[in-house]
Amino acid sequence: MRGLGLWLLGAMMLPAIAPSRPWALMEQYEVVLPWRLPGPRVRRALPSHLGLHPERVSYVLGATGHNFTLHLRKNRDLLGSGYTETYTAANGSEVTEQPRGQDHCFYQGHVEGYPDSAASLSTCAGLRGFFQVGSDLHLIEPLDEGGEGGRHAVYQAEHLLQTAGTCGVSDDSLGSLLGPRTAAVFRPRPGDSLPSRETRYVELYVVVDNAEFQMLGSEAAVRHRVLEVVNHVDKLYQKLNFRVVLVGLEIWNSQDRFHVSPDPSVTLENLLTWQARQRTRRHLHDNVQLITGVDFTGTTVGFARVSAMCSHSSGAVNQDHSKNPVGVACTMAHEMGHNLGMDHDENVQGCRCQERFEAGRCIMAGSIGSSFPRMFSDCSQAYLESFLERPQSVCLANAPDLSHLVGGPVCGNLFVERGEQCDCGPPEDCRNRCCNSTTCQLAEGAQCAHGTCCQECKVKPAGELCRPKKDMCDLEEFCDGRHPECPEDAFQENGTPCSGGYCYNGACPTLAQQCQAFWGPGGQAAEESCFSYDILPGCKASRYRADMCGVLQCKGGQQPLGRAICIVDVCHALTTEDGTAYEPVPEGTRCGPEKVCWKGRCQDLHVYRSSNCSAQCHNHGVCNHKQECHCHAGWAPPHCAKLLTEVHAASGSLPVFVVVVLVLLAVVLVTLAGIIVYRKARSRILSRNVAPKTTMGRSNPLFHQAASRVPAKGGAPAPSRGPQELVPTTHPGQPARHPASSVALKRPPPAPPVTVSSPPFPVPVYTRQAPKQVIKPTFAPPVPPVKPGAGAANPGPAEGAVGPKVALKPPIQRKQGAGAPTAP
């Protein structure tokens, strides 16, 4: 039976060649029946935020004669904390909402037994996505409505029939924007490791036009398509130590908000102009991407601005040109690469793509071949690192709000969140020996696991360089010896002289630099006389300015696409992105000796420079752009007056005044505790001494009952007392001792009984019941009355007389049916 079960399992995992193609877009494929591996048992009632899809899932499927085991984890970082969706309601009004229960079915992972493998799939309605093994990229999608266990097609990208696509960013425009590149700049990186810098984050906003909505048919289908695409893009960028987080989705289900032209350059300019007008109304983001169902002219499938990330021009347009979402995901990753400063691989001599030529090209190839790319080339990584050195890229260092990521903190998502000391990804992908990937806690003996000031699981010593100086307006940063992260990036003090200008927030703005940024390398600042013009909307020029802080005037270069210009003589003014005004001279630009443009006027440097800031740094540092001391290596902030080693040593022991405060606080607490204890004890003592009712032998009711009812045999019987009252033995020759008490008796003591010959009185029989507790008096117990006429001491017993006096004992208790007590 077991052999039959294994045979059936093997039959399920082996692929079956389909007798016919399900659609004409696929040239060759294999039919597989994925088998989901049983996961660990969980409670039936899952928390609501976990949704219907598990955090982890594994599938076994067969393709190309092999059985592949895919281990997947839900991409909890796919959606940002403030993720919103915008669409048009039935009444025509625009609706923006944050969906509740943002659970999804998009996963990332790896293939068991294959190093450097990758997988990105959705499990919403069957399996759809890709998994990479070595240089082979396998695509999978369902063939029927059988769900995850139904028939699926597995094929390689080159077997998907599609037209070749190209990037609309021309090589000429790239060359003019990026300048010449040599092979020496792009030496191959040793190994295939991630960059050692901190993780960068792209907060993405996606717009879907009406043509795409009509093609997919519903808002739900659009949402699913976009999440699939972004999930793939995020997976592609993870190898560059980047994360792509979707913070907003806008679906034009009614009509387009601007004209989507078949000309991709026009559509891009319309997108950026619309974004500039709507930016304050939309979720804050770093990059906007349009996905359109419009067929662009020629072979172009994407168009983007180069090196525009973190600016108002940060965006791109993408044609949804493939039935498989991996196709548009690769296009979006390519265009986003242009936004990050990357050039086409073909334009760089010596650029190396680690992919085999027959397996496909890298992501930044100028055209898409028969297979989808899956990695970035060496030169693309070098371009990226160069872009990240610019002050412009600062927006990428801002991580999303980790405390509000959709799904909450999850160990293994590469985000160090609440309750975690480190996060190196899932156990199968983690290569960081300083971090326990299953608990996201530091390994035993490790001080750190991440950060540029962390080396071999230890924090680097104070004074080691962790961020070098990039240019004249930058400052180098050093490790402080206590934290694994490099201190915040700081710049020279605003107003510090630099090449042809003065530093301002880490840049050296000059007129020539600004003209080159807009008009390309050939752009130059126009003659000084041009700056005396003020250009009003509609290209109305008026000559009355007395400084050079009005409209930016340039000459030479190439006119930017989608921008209108105003030409006055040899002066060229460029319209802003929204077309409502003309580009001004940026703040901080030099307008004369010791003068800069500030709030539209040419003013003295002292408008933002403190004359005595650096004097506070004790000659061991300089003032930075925040008017704070930036200390030299080994010196401690805030005023660079002490060495870091001295500060760290002093921090190991508490200051004297802190010790004094702690001692005084301890004394006060002990005193208060003593007062409280004393008051409680005193109150208990007083409560016991509040006039207790005295129980005396003379007031014992049993005494009176015995004396009045039954005379004692031959003398007075000892009065009955409670079990806790002891009366000392009194001899006849001793006087009776009265109790030392100030309480006066209200009635005289009873007269001694007369000796009568009578049978002994019966002793009452009591049930076994606990005697009633009485308060023990604080004075001596009473002495029983002495028999009158007592003779000499110690008389011998005589007939009819009682024996010596003994302490009063409680009545003898007998069980029912017992005989009468015998005389003692």
Swiss-Prot record:
- Extracellular compartment: which residues? 17-655
Which major enzyme category is it?
hydrolase
Gene Ontology cellular-component terms for this entry are: alpha9-beta1 integrin-ADAM8 complex; cell surface; cytoplasm; dense core granule membrane; ficolin-1-rich granule membrane; phagolysosome; plasma membrane; podosome
According to the record's subunit comment, the protein's assembly and interactions are:
Interacts with FST3.
Which residues lie in Low complexity bias regions?
A: 788-804
Q: How does it sit in the membrane?
A: Single-pass type I membrane protein
| Annotated region (Disordered), positions in chain | 710-756, 776-824
Q: What pairs make up the disulfide bonds?
A: 310-395, 351-379, 353-362, 435-457, 448-454, 466-486, 473-503, 498-508, 566-613, 613-623, 617-629, 631-640
Gene Ontology MF terms in the entry: calcium ion binding; cell adhesion molecule binding; immunoglobulin receptor binding; metalloendopeptidase activity; metallopeptidase activity; serine-type endopeptidase activity; tumor necrosis factor receptor superfamily binding; zinc ion binding
List of glycosylated residues: 67, 91, 436, 612
Keywords linked to the UniProt accession? Disulfide bond, EGF-like domain, Glycoprotein, Hydrolase, Membrane, Metal-binding, Metalloprotease, Protease, Signal, Transmembrane, Transmembrane helix, Zinc
Range of residues in the leader sequence: 1-16
Segments on the Cytoplasmic side according to the record's topology features = 677-824
Among CDD domains, the record links this protein to: ZnMc_adamalysin_II_like
Q: Which residues form the Disintegrin domain?
A: 408-494
Q: In which tissues is it expressed?
A: Expressed on neutrophils and monocytes.
Q: What is this protein called?
A: Disintegrin and metalloproteinase domain-containing protein 8
Looking at the record, the residues that make up the Peptidase M12B domain are 200-400
Active site residues per record: 335
Q: Name one GO biological process term.
A: positive regulation of innate immune response
Q: What does this protein do?
A: Possible involvement in extravasation of leukocytes.
Q: Which gene encodes it?
A: ADAM8
Using the UniProt record, give the first listed, main subcellular location. Answer: membrane
List where this protein forms a coiled coil. Answer: none
Give TM segment ranges.
Answer: 656-676
Where it sits in the cell: the answer is: Membrane
Enzyme Commission number: 3.4.24.-
Question: What does UniProt list as this organism's lineage?
Answer: Eukaryota, Metazoa, Chordata, Craniata, Vertebrata
